[in-house]
Amino acid sequence: MLDLKFVRDHFAEAEQRLATRGGAVDLSAFTDLDARRRTLLGESESLKAEKNQVSALIGKTKDKSQVQGEIARMKDVSVRIKELDEELKQVEGDLRTLLMTLPNLPHEDCPVGTSEDDNKEVRRWGQVPEFDFEAQSHWDIGERLDILDFERAGKLAGARFAIYKGAGARLERALINFMLDLHTGEHKYVEILPPLMVNRDTMTGTGQLPKFESDLFHLDDPDFFLIPTAEVPVTNIHRDEILADGDLPVCYAAYTPCFRKEAGSHGRDTRGLIRMHQFNKVELVKFARPEESDQELLKLLDNAEEVLRRLKLPYRVVDLCTGDIGFSAARTFDIEVWLPGQQTFREISSCSNFRDFQARRAAIRFRREEKGKPELVHTLNGSGLAVGRTLVAILENYQQEDGSVVIPEALRPYMGGVEKISA
């Protein structure tokens, strides 16, 4: 959620930066509500001060007959104060609701643009493989090796689901364990295993609600949501808490299944594992001091990249433009892995700095000194990595002419020493 005071004091800047996300931004409703709030608050506080002053005078007067007029007037003042406070509560609620629908302000260094075409490539790593045969897509490879079954998954649940079988299931599990071991061992993240269902306050804290409720899988009774990413429960671990300055940055790594409707993806990626209703992901979440969050984002990005470097999968890093970053993000770097079967790079991780946007919604603060005033932390997260898409990249980049798939060396200890998957 945006800082009310910042929007008020830097209105033109806020409007201009929001406009770079694409489309016209009309903040007139905000100015109207904020002006009404300040008017109501001023009148209410003035009447309360007057009431206190007159009440003190009445209390000192022994002969109450001399102040009957003031007593009667104070009754009217009390009624008016109640009316003002009730309207103020309504206006503040409307103002908060409006702020909840506004996206984050893009970072000052975020490239300005309207779509993914305006994203800026930062760097590439690894060598794109060249085959002496026609590269196959992962769905063909997986079905031929009998390690992926989309047809039977469709029978069980419908489109955008998959069954992993045999070496396919083991490879998925190996990737999860490899990623968690890397992040918790070498990168020093603390492992978290959170709930897969959360309440409305939790979804609101990270920005999924109220704007994106239609994109979420919802349970009516009780009122729970299936998580679209571990970012949601893990960030909310410290909702309504004050962290100690000495504990920052706090770094968590969590493996969870994720659940998404993909309502806006009709007709896109209808085959394979790229866009699923249910998929596995290892998520990295950080809580940092405001002045250190930009640097922490680069560290998080490098931690995610290291997974691909260890697996020797070619990738590139892209700095997302203002028109392509997510609702809650101020700055986002995408990692895109090369997929020979599609002859293109595809997103495998998004690493974002949300600054204090989520922390303000979720009331996550820290205290620099024992008796210092609490400040909002900055929150960050990124995929480290999307497991299914990593499996896709392995199948396509390590495919052999005879139809087999070589297991990356880094994964072989997690595969019981298996070096190749063959039919």
Curated annotation (Swiss-Prot):
It is found in: Cytoplasm. SUPFAM superfamilies: Class II aaRS and biotin synthetases, tRNA-binding arm. It catalyses: tRNA(Ser) + L-serine + ATP = L-seryl-tRNA(Ser) + AMP + diphosphate + H(+); tRNA(Sec) + L-serine + ATP = L-seryl-tRNA(Sec) + AMP + diphosphate + H(+). One of its GO terms (biological process) is seryl-tRNA aminoacylation. Its EC number is 6.1.1.11. InterPro entries: aa-tRNA-synt_IIb, aa-tRNA-synth_II, aa-tRNA-synth_II/BPL/LPL, Ser-tRNA-ligase_type_1, Ser-tRNA-synth_1_N, SerRS_1_N_sf, SerRS_core, tRNA-bd_arm. Consists of two distinct domains, a catalytic core and a N-terminal extension that is involved in tRNA binding. Catalyzes the attachment of serine to tRNA(Ser). Is also able to aminoacylate tRNA(Sec) with serine, to form the misacylated tRNA L-seryl-tRNA(Sec), which will be further converted into selenocysteinyl-tRNA(Sec). Belongs to the class-II aminoacyl-tRNA synthetase family. Type-1 seryl-tRNA synthetase subfamily. Homodimer. The tRNA molecule binds across the dimer. This is Serine--tRNA ligase. It comes from Syntrophotalea carbinolica (strain DSM 2380 / NBRC 103641 / GraBd1). The gene is serS.
